[in-house]
Amino acid sequence: MLRILAPTDFSTDGYNATLVAMQLAKALRAEVVFVHAMAKPPVPAASPESIFRSVYSEEMRKTQVRLLDEAQHLLDILDLRHAEVRYKTLVVPTPFADAMLQVIASENIDLVVIGSRGSSQLKQILIGSNTLELMRLSPVPLLVIPSYDVFDGFENITILLEQMKLPERAGIEMLDSIAQTYNAMLHFLILTKDGQQVQDVSELQEQHSSWQQVLKRPHTTNLLADSEAPTGMRAHIAATNSSLVVLMPEKLSIWEALFSKNLSEELAARAHMPLLILPHKV
């Protein structure tokens, strides 16, 4: 059974991402693991150890109850029974990124569904610091859900290739499962240089075998000159009516990769577009 990690900080943005995680879990027949990374309780440093432990235990109890209540609320508003979507809740008393990496390993997570901004209410912040850190460190694919996104499945998916190759990535099987579940049309968008041409993405000489099943699905191949990336990507997404963009960063720093090739303007313009990040295999 597939397992989906759904971090939450109890913000509106985090709640929206957990809602999508539950909907995906039903469609993919997956289990959801709801996780909250709990900060240390606000106890003065000079307080006795017994007081700290007492406050800590109470905060842990309250957080666990709140997390369970949120999970049950999601079932209620989606009109689901617990038997339809299995889930568990975890409260991990460590910093966010460390907590998520621990759970990814211990719970054999296949996909992380996370909000783009979390508790940050600054409108100019498109992707919050916790999300960015996990995008950089996660060994499994991340589905980044923007604020106030209304999830309605993925009928058209754009897969952005920054080079003339289909690289090996963690999560290609997850992409294939999503495409199969939603009967999606895949639209490969290849950034090209120096007039490079290809009729179909399957013709690329550099492609990993894990893409074979994906390429059997209905797909289109589109070329975009590197110099025209911002406006061309906007036109492509509009023309294909894409509801998901798949990114496979080449650089070590995913932030640098996302905002290379003049794509920062485009990603900012499409901030409401869910992003599926396929990381390098570790």
Give the location of each predicted region.
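Small/aliphatic-rich secondary-structure junction motif
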Residues: 1-54, 79, 156-222, 239-244, ...
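Short glycine-rich, flexible loops that bind phosphorylated cofactors or substrates
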Residues: 13, 120-121, 166, 253-255
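A short acidic, glycine-rich active-site loop
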Residues: 53-66
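Structural beta-alpha unit
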Residues: 73-112, 213-245, 250-265, 269, ...
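Hydrophobic alpha-helical segments and helix pairs
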Residues: 102-147
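Charged helix-capping and loop-helix junction motifs
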Residues: 127-130, 202-206, 259-264
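Active-site phosphate/pyrophosphate- and oxyanion-stabilizing loops and adjacent acidic/basic residues
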Residues: 132, 176, 209, 234, ...
